[in-house]
Amino acid sequence: MQVIQIGSIAVLLKWLLLGAALFIGLAILKLWLRRTQEKILHKQVIDLFFNSLFFGFICWKGSLFIIDPVLVIKSPLSLLYFTGGTTGLVLAVVGSIIFYFFKANKSNITDRLILQSGFLYSFAVIGVYHLLATLLLEEQKLNHIISGLYTFAIVIFAFWKHQMVTQQRIFSSLILFSFLSLSLSFIQLSVERKIWFFSAQQWFFVALIIVSLIFWDKKSKS
């Protein structure tokens, strides 16, 4: 694993790339909103994403309580220097998704825009991350190239054919992406800790497939 030294703190390069992808994803989302939505909605949607990201960051740092509570009890300052790793990231993603939909449903944003914005932002972040990882990381090149190409193709389609980004197409894309990610994770023989034969990341994609199948044709308010 590649590490970047920032003062006295050593940070994995992949986390820095993810942080950069999160903010670049917001810029891409803002461009999409300008292209497709009324100006009055722009700030409301962007603020919702900022709040969701902050909540996800708190979940990521706080996940150490669940993953290694003994370490936190013995050394509370470990929360400043350590995270829950990939498992913690999965918990953070789940937490931020729940927060996003919970807050969005209390707003005047339509279900369609909530779903489209969340989908576009997620795929933009994934695409940017895999592009940066392909260029700057040494491991899992195949995963980064394939996942990056797939997600960027979806983002480009959403930009130029936004009226065709329907609920069914969104969940179909999520299902295909989840199967693709699962296949790549099995091919690369991940060494992550297993929970009932799967890693936390693999279980996330299994859950995403199930949720997508449930909501694929569920009616929503326009």
Model-derived regions, located:
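Hydrophobic, membrane-interfacing alpha helices
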Residues: 1-222
